[in-house]
Amino acid sequence: MTTNPDIVKQTKNEIHQVTSRVQEKLDSKSTNAVEQNNNSSQASVTKDNKKKAAKRAKKKAAKKKKQSAAASASSTPVEEAQHAQEEQQEQTILQEPGFTQTIVEKDADQVDEPLEPIASSALGTVEPPTDNKPSASTSTAVPTTEARNTSITEPANSPSSSSSSASTKSTATTQSADYVVAEHFAPQRNDEQLGNSPASITSKPATTSAAQPSSKVEENMAKATSQPITTAEKEIPELKPIEPEAIMISKEINTTHDQAAATTTAAVASASTTATAESHAVADGIMNDNVLESIGENVQQETVFEDASDIPHADVIPHTTTVTVEEESPIALGQGGVTHEATTSARASASGIPGAFEEVQQTVQEDLPHPTAETVEIARFAEQPVRAQQPEQYESSVVQEATETVTDVGKGVSSTVKNEVNVPSTIPTESENPVAVGGTTAEHPVQEAVTAPTETAHDFSKETTTASKRVSKHDKASAEKHKVARKPSSTGQEPTTPSTPAKSAQSSKHARRPSKQASAPSSPGTTSAAVPGGKKSAIEAAAPIPTSADTVESKHAAGSGSATTIPSPGSATTKPTPGSATTKPTPVSATEEHAAGTTKPAPAAGATATAENETADGKAQTATDGEAAPKKSWFKRMKKSFGKLFH
């Protein structure tokens, strides 16, 4: 890292230009300020001082009267002489032309502090206060002006001791721009650093007024003057060490690199490494940062190597790795885990170490199954540890879990499909797909999904078996069957199971048809507005049907020997008993059903036209009619998106 001498020269020139401009500005500002201060302070301060002196004189006169009356016996001629000196001194102060010191108005019982003038030296110093103690030779009574000038004790070698005078007029006018610029660029020195200089001996004056030149400027001037440095001298020591400093910096960087390399080598060469203290040094080449963060007391490593100086730091391989996997850790979320990473790097870097790769591989086999796409779901079903060669058990557990968590009737099938779409498992063959019971018409969305030889067929067929599992599990509770059967019908499909409950549902519909038709003439005293011809009025058809009534009626039908899972079409009964004096469960014709519009709820809106038309392919009509039609479009969209994925 070398420095161009041209750049150094250019920098010097720029600094010279800047300092000269600053010097000119400070020259003009300081001269203007000094003139203004001299003009204003001579006029205003003398007026203020005269007013304040008059007040003080009145107070002191009253004070003298009190003192003379109280302590007339103890008064001595020395004290009277001191009082006379004080009065004479006040007049002298007011007559001095360049005096800018404010006389502070004090209480009657306060002791006067000595007033220090601003001494001017040959260098034009403005002497600031450095400590609060009054000088040694000043007494309680303020001496005269001559006594005050001589009371500033200065060492013999002081440059200002020979030329100290009582006149302070030349103080501000002798401000040199060199000193101002030097003060501007010089580091701020505090009063302790000024301890040995001749400027630090005088005592602190009383409070200064606003009309006086700023005490900060005077203080800075004094600091700069105590160690005089001109502007030209100031630049050169700053610019001189640039080139050697650059070389030193580069040397420091190289030394730091060498030391860091030596430290790393020493850390790797240690015989055994504890997991908490130095796990980063050993495990850095094997595990990623996520795993390193989760390393705690669960990982214990012993380092295997032939000669520590011959093996680079990244090639050291721990031969025993014990990993405790939690569900929240990144290992359980399919990132491969510690052992998978260890296997990969061991295969790459263990060629020089005999036996190391076999040990790592063995550890992988023992601790975790090989990470596959199923690792995501293993964390959810931790009570059933699943290997990759057991897809049947895994599939059934996922379907069972997803189905058991569904409690809402209306959203059951859709949420089950969501849970199962993300599950990668074995694709069943064509023979494994259960055949739909309700006919083979193209309108049935599940039938299309089953016959399509893609993974979409697998997902929806699993959904079908889900419904059958729910039916067979709750075989004894007919109300639960009713809820399960309504779940697929609300999304536009039927449970296509080869088991008996769905067939019994089909047969029960044929068995229920004559009972409903027989109940119509057997109740002549009906209170409902029955239309001749076995049809309901439009008001009844449009009336909302409560879900509890459907459940009660299906319970009644199940009690009479049928195992129905489909709600009665168009039923508006409030009491399920056939032949009662309440509203008859008369089937609704297709005309009135469509005239009723969308005010009918889901079970009645999905009903078929009449009871006579309720044949085997009535299921297809039920699935596509009424409210279930938009749900079918959802299945079509799902099929379309999955077809894009898998083809």
Swiss-Prot record:
Top-rank taxon: Eukaryota
Disordered: region residues: 1-241, 387-647
Stretches with biased composition (Polar residues): 29-46, 92-103, 146-155, 193-215, 390-406, 413-432, 488-508, 561-589
Annotated Low complexity bias: 134-145, 156-177, 518-530, 596-613
Any one Gene Ontology cellular component term annotated for this protein: plasma membrane
Biased composition (Basic residues): 49-67, 633-647
Modified residues (Phosphothreonine): T168, T491
Protein name, entry field: Meiotically up-regulated protein C8C9.04
